[in-house]
């Protein structure tokens, strides 16, 4: 038991009396504490005044007021800190929300477990079984990430409904025969160039053109597709320029290559291309080396091919690499006499003459690799047919998969520029 010595000073009239004696500590109930606190909120009352009236320390009464304002009546009775009612309500609300989310995710998890049994092929296959087993449409659409409106359409279809996209059964026999005919003559052609040749033949016959995707599907089903090309590592040297131009007779490019005949004889070919329509303007083949005279012959043949006996009205760029036959003074002087402006690529930059480099790869892959070349004379004759086939029939991706001369005729018949013809 705690014994307190209380000192009271009573003022009676003008005499002051000190009262000294033992006094027990008074324990107040919760109701008494609340009454004292409420009295401190009355008008004209202060914490200090009410505390003196009831013999309570002002700090203790201030603590009771704080606990009372926070709604912690239990704290007033127990004399210890508890969570305020506002925080308790927020915590209870959060607990209810977490319980709702937990139940929602549990249902979604159960739905997805059942959907795995049905939806290994396509998601729409799992719709009907799941909804038939009692799952809601909204829950199914949200879990499977499909359109809710489309689910409603599927559920309301009649029993005799048929998918019009799958009701057409086309006969691919004739198309397959034509594909075999094309790749029989040109085995290095992929489905895009096969489609281009079939499209051209259909235009000549006045028949509807075949879709490229259909050609791809037929060739894939019959194992006629070419092997995918291996990924080429990117070059460390960035090439930001553009070799191709939008109009013909603005820039020509030239390069050379060689190949070996079956008897060991080597032929060296020099050619010139237009950097817009990709037509092989002129070419020359020899068993000797690449020299200035051969390049001059190719220059003259290219000018005669495009301008006849006249010279170009404006200079045409003559783009080549840094070979000695192209940098010779005689070659450059002769080029300027013909109205050509010699341009050389940067050192060790084959990309700067990429059109000519690509042409070399095309000729070697699609023609030289499959044509008979027992000796130099036979190879030269077959090479002439290869250049003619390239100009007249070989589809080029940059020309909308049309051949160079087909591209030129298409633009001339429609009265369009080369740039607009390419868009068509």
Swiss-Prot record:
Keywords: Transposable element. It holds the Pfam family rve. It comes from the Bacteria. Disulfide bonds: none annotated. One of its GO terms (molecular function) is DNA binding. GO terms for biological process: DNA integration; DNA transposition. Residues 229-412 form the Integrase catalytic domain. InterPro entries: Homeodomain-like_sf (IPR009057), HTH-like_dom (IPR025948), Integrase_cat-core (IPR001584), RNaseH-like_sf (IPR012337), RNaseH_sf (IPR036397), Transpos_IS3 (IPR048020), Transposase_8 (IPR002514). Belongs to the transposase 8 family. This is Insertion element IS2A uncharacterized 48.2 kDa protein. It comes from Escherichia coli.
């Amino acid at each position: 038991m705690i014994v307190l010595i209380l000192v009271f000073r009573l003022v009676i009239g003008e005499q002051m009396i000190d009262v000294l004696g033992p006094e027990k500590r008074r324990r107040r109930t919760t109701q008494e504490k609340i009454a004292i606190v409420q009295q401190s909120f009355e008008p004209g009352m202060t914490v200090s005044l009410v505390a003196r009236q009831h013999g309570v320390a002002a700090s203790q009464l201030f603590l009771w007021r704080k606990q009372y304002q926070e709604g912690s009546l239990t704290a007033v009775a127990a004399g210890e800190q508890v969570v305020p009612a506002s925080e308790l309500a927020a915590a209870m609300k959060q607990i209810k929300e977490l319980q709702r989310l937990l139940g929602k995710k549990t249902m979604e998890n159960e739905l997805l477990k059942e959907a795995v049994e049905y939806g290994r092929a396509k998601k729409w296959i799992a719709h009907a079984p799941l909804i038939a087993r009692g799952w809601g449409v909204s829950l199914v659409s949200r879990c499977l990430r499909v359109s809710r409106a489309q689910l409603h359409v599927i559920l309301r279809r009649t029993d005799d409904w048929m998918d019009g996209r799958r009701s057409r059964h086309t006969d691919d026999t004739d198309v397959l025969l034509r594909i075999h005919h094309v790749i029989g003559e040109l085995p290095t052609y992929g489905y895009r160039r096969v489609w281009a040749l079939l499209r051209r033949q259909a235009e000549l016959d006045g028949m509807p053109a075949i879709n490229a995707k259909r050609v791809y599907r037929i060739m894939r089903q019959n194992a006629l597709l070419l092997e995918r090309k291996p990924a080429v590592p990117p070059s460390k040297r960035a090439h930001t320029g553009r070799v191709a131009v939008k109009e013909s007779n603005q820039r020509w490019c030239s390069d050379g290559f060689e190949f070996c005949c079956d008897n060991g004889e080597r032929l060296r070919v020099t050619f010139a291309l237009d950097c817009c329509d990709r037509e092989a303007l002129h070419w020359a083949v020899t068993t000797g080396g690449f020299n200035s005279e051969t390049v001059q012959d190719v220059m003259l043949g290219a000018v005669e091919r495009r301008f006849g006996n006249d010279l170009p009205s404006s200079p045409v760029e003559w783009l080549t690499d840094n070979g000695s036959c192209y940098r010779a003074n005689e070659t450059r002087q002769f080029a300027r006499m013909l109205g050509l402006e010699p341009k050389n690529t940067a050192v060790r930059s084959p990309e700067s003459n990429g059109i000519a480099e690509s042409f070399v790869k095309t000729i070697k892959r699609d023609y030289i690799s499959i044509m008979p070349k027992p000796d130099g004379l036979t190879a030269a004759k077959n090479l002439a047919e290869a250049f003619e086939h390239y100009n007249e029939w070989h589809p080029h991706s940059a020309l909308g998969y049309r051949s160079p001369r087909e591209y030129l005729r298409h633009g001339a018949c429609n009265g369009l520029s080369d740039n607009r013809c390419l868009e068509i």
